[in-house]
Amino acid sequence: DKSAQLEAFMATWGQTMGQQYKSYTNQMSVDLYGLKVPQVILNGEWKMAIGGVPVSAEWSESGTGQADYQITAVYSDAETEPYLKKHVYLFGFQQNQPKVLVTQQNQGNPDNYLYFNETANNELKNGFNQIVYG
């Protein structure tokens, strides 16, 4: 099952990065500096932005849906990393393409945007692609 594969991959990848990642869901959010992710995105309190562009987002076990971005998994090291070193990764799909997004945002802004960018980490991108297409 793909979620078990991703969990195993994130445990191994986290070790190589010296970080400890935990899985979160639409029912159980991570606390990122007081923001509950992905809850604040899914309930509309905060608008998700990818590369500065606001997008709609939804939780999707299958990776398909109507929104701009389908969130299939959330991983974070926020419980174990110190202040300003916390990461939240969203694993999902944009226009049916697998995409791993990351945020380290630690403060609010007037637009209530939660800013994500596609991860620059090729090992992480390739790992997710292999699980999706494997």
Over which residues does each language-model region extend?
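Mature, Sec-exported extracytoplasmic domains of Gram-positive
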Residues: 1-134
